[in-house]
From Swiss-Prot:
One of its GO terms (molecular function) is transcription cis-regulatory region binding. It holds the Pfam family Myb_DNA-binding. It comes from the Eukaryota. Transcription factors that activates genes required for endodermal differentiation but represses genes involved in proliferative divisions, thus regulating the transition from proliferation to differentiation in root endodermis. Required for Casparian strip formation by positively regulating the expression of the Casparian strip genes CASP1, PER64 and ESB1 and other endodermis-specific genes, thus triggering correct localized lignin biosynthesis in root endodermis and subsequently regulating global ion homeostasis. Residues 38-62, 90-113 bind DNA. Induction: Directly up-regulated by SCARECROW (SCR), as part of the differentiation program controlled by SHORT-ROOT (SHR). Disruption phenotype: In myb36-1, myb36-2 and myb36-4, impaired Casparian strips formation replaced by ectopic lignin-like material in the corners of endodermal cells, associated with reduced expression of several endodermis-specific genes and abnormal CASP1 localization in the plasma membrane. Multiple changes to leaf ionome, including elevated concentrations of sodium, magnesium, and zinc and decreased calcium, manganese, and iron. Longer root hairs. Delayed and defective barrier (Casparian strips) formation as well as extra cell divisions in the meristem in roots. It is found in: Nucleus. It comes from Arabidopsis thaliana. Residues 136-150 have a biased composition (Low complexity). This is Transcription factor MYB36. Residues 9-62, 63-117 form the HTH myb-type domain. The keyword Ribonucleoprotein does not apply. One of its GO terms (cellular component) is Casparian strip.
Amino acid sequence: MGRAPCCDKANVKKGPWSPEEDVKLKDYIDKYGTGGNWIALPQKIGLKRCGKSCRLRWLNYLRPNIKHGGFSEEEDRIILSLYISIGSRWSIIAAQLPGRTDNDIKNYWNTKLKKKLLGRQKQMNRQDSITDSTENNLSNNNNNKSPQNLSNSALERLQLHMQLQNLQSPFSSFYNNPILWPKLHPLLQSTTTNQNPKLASQESFHPLGVNVDHQHNNTKLAQINNGASSLYSENVEQSQNPAHEFQPNFGFSQDLRLDNHNMDFMNRGVSKELFQVGNEFELTNGSSWWSEEVELERKTTSSSSWGSASVLDQTTEGMVMLQDYAQMSYHSV
């Protein structure tokens, strides 16, 4: 037993609807509604139509909230993207387009939109014939293998997906095709290639952002301080032990004299630079105390004698001067 027919097929009119039939159906539904029974509706109106035909005519054409006319570009993009993702589920696609019915979208897709998009794809394929021959061979091999593995609908959706990408980024073919890029002059190209290694060699930084030269200077300063502290501790132990005779280190004393001479020269340079800065900003009188203090320190340092009464004082003073010189050399770097 099958489903009972909704109407008598022998006495039902088929074919397109006339304007008079549209007016009768629309006026009756506006006044009385459908009543929830589409099978009995044609008899009440006096139409020789099937109840299903009346329902589809009302839902697809005669409803007041239906959009009539052509589709916009935004609607075309929505239909295309949804068709690529879910296929021909027209009712779901129609739910995303207010005022459009599933039947209207299906008819528009089959008659106009699909042909227009596939026609654009063929035209762009002709324009892309200037691409590399190897890329063309690969694309031809893929096109020859695709019908064996994909159905017609899946292949169509794949082609439309490529078309959608071309619509969203029309310059993608230019960016992905190095043949179309402008060529530089050979002299300019060689110049740019020669400059790149120089720039790379000049960047001598640690991967964590630490300067290698600065880190090397810190290592040298730490070594100088460690050596000075070890010498100072040895001299203190010798002074505290009266049984141990002190043996002067002539090489170390000569190094200290050389450091003393270098510090004298550096102090003179610092005082001259400070005096010049004071002249530029008209602050020579206000900064005279600073130059006098530096000059006094220079005289005190240069007049220090190595023939003092205590050998421990000489060694301690030498250690302090060595540490000060190491700090000044570090700051000058």
